[in-house]
Amino acid sequence: MQYSHHCEHLLERLNKQREAGFLCDCTIVIGEFQFKAHRNVLASFSEYFGAIYRSTSENNVFLDQSQVKADGFQKLLEFIYTGTLNLDSWNVKEIHQAADYLKVEEVVTKCKIKMEDFAFIANPSSTEISSITGNIELNQQTCLLTLRDYNSREKSEVSTDLVQANPKQGALAKKSSQTKKKKKAFNSQKTGQNKTVQYPSDILENASVELFLDANKLSTPIIEQVAQRSNSELELTSVVENTFPAQDIVQTVTVKRKRGKSQPNCALKEHSMSNIASVKNSYELESSGEELDQRYSKAKPMCNTCGKVFSEASSLRRHMRIHKGVKPYVCHLCGKAFTQCNQLKTHVRTHTGEKPYKCELCDKGFAQKCQLVFHSRMHHGEEKPYKCDVCNLQFATSSNLKIHARKHSGEKPYVCDRCGQRFAQASTLTYHVRRHTGEKPYVCDTCGKAFAVSSSLITHSRKHTGERPFICELCGNSYTDIKNLKKHKTKVHSGADKILDSSIEDHPLNEQDSIQKSPLSETLDVKPSDVTLPLTLPLGAEDHHLLLPVADSQPPAPDALLRPAANGYSEPQLIFLQQLY
């Protein structure tokens, strides 16, 4: 039986492992960027990586930045693990260059096809644009201006209108409806005046702006001017001469693009549009750019992957590193990489031992401020603001409350890829996986013993330092960990029988210590010959004649040797033998 979605499921699991850095056995380094991946996956899709891993076992592969850009490689990596490839006029060249260098032939083919579709960008002559004057033959009756990327952002706010050209009326554009606010229409401009609509650069940064001019076999003199200014603004101005006395239309679209980009995705095309209804979500440019800017400023950037909303675009860019697996901040002491700079700063403190956040009550230091807040709430009676709705227990952090709530709901979202066991906490899954791998990253500096869990190392180190921070408030006994303290309270202070002293519980005594500390050893000098040992021996009927009565130290009588043994013994007999030395 073959499962149709088995391959997709495998790729999905591998991609999740890559994003989490789990079982990744290689790191691709491009400048300051690092990408975790699996060798066998890369070698399966790239002849370049296949050749490298046949000849070397190095974990790190350094790629030439002039040949492979980080953004292009990121898209290529996503294609390898997901099978999806999003190409546009901005990234197609970088992806094609990276795929060609790494010998990913399938992507090279796709990029070539896509670049042919974008050929009008590299060859403006195909659009028949005259720099000064010219005649453009328009075949249909529609003039449509589409701003594609802005479509998805202002879908609910911007009206969708179709700008139609009617030579008899003498107007190329006319609004079909009026909004509540007063706006100036395109057809209200005077002859020779240019109205420039400026959009925020981040809106049009990846936008694809296409201007479709069609008329019913209309030959109209038109002035087209394409000028690239020094500040990297590409301004496309269309001035239609006043051939009809009723209306004059002047349209200007300003598209800002970043420095270093080859050509913006903006072109003047001629199309024979047989079915105008098939064109959806076409937007009419408003002459009031200020109002559009105000509406756009209210929109907050949102992650397309998880839906999280951010106050600033820079926060979104940092957040996207989590989904892409990009970790540009590397520790120079141990080589560990992080997605954010503050994570690296906190990590470096584990090497330096710096703890800048001090508790005012006990002078204990912490590497992070959140650790200090948690400590104060746990040990110094500060308010625990997070309360469980089911059992009313209060917690110091929201994450602790979330984990606790899973006890009531039974939710266990973290699954082991090896055995299928589920866990409520991610850290518990991490410790569980180490049982499979045998990894023990926490090593004692004193004796060299290694542990899979950091708390085990902390408890172990107290044996070297003699620290016993857990004290019983009833009797004053102290312990190295909370587990032994709870055990002590259960056995000693719950009405059960008394157990040994806490020192014996913490450090079990050996045989020699038990003899030396026995009450008998303080009063009597016990010799081995004075100790009788009860032995249980199974005796058969034929063995009964071997039993000899022993009275004091007198030898048995001669006739006793001939006396028959008693019959009917059904239970094992206890014979006390005196040890002879």
From Swiss-Prot:
Motif Nuclear localization signal, chain ranges: 174-190, 256-261
Keywords of this entry: DNA-binding, Metal-binding, Nucleus, Phosphoprotein, Repeat, Transcription, Transcription regulation, Zinc, Zinc-finger
Keyword Cytoplasm applies: no
Residue ranges constituting the BTB domain according to the UniProt record: 24-89
GO CC annotations on file: nucleoplasm
Chain intervals annotated as zinc finger (C2H2-type): 301-323, 329-351, 357-380, 386-408, 414-436, 442-464, 470-493
Cellular localization per UniProt: Nucleus
Pfam families assigned to the protein according to its UniProt record, in alphabetical order: BTB (PF00651), zf-C2H2 (PF00096), zf-C2H2_6 (PF13912)
GO BP, sorted A to Z: negative regulation of transcription by RNA polymerase II; regulation of cytokine production; regulation of immune system process
PROSITE patterns: BTB, ZINC_FINGER_C2H2_1, ZINC_FINGER_C2H2_2
InterPro entries: BTB/POZ_dom (IPR000210), SKP1/BTB/POZ_sf (IPR011333), Znf_C2H2_sf (IPR036236), Znf_C2H2_type (IPR013087), ZnFinger_BTB_dom_contain (IPR050457)
Family annotation (Gene3D superfamilies): Classic Zinc Finger, Potassium Channel Kv1.1, Chain A
Family per similarity comment: Belongs to the krueppel C2H2-type zinc-finger protein family.
Name under which the protein is recorded: Myoneurin
Organism name: Bos taurus
Source organism phylogeny: Eukaryota, Metazoa, Chordata, Craniata, Vertebrata
Gene: MYNN
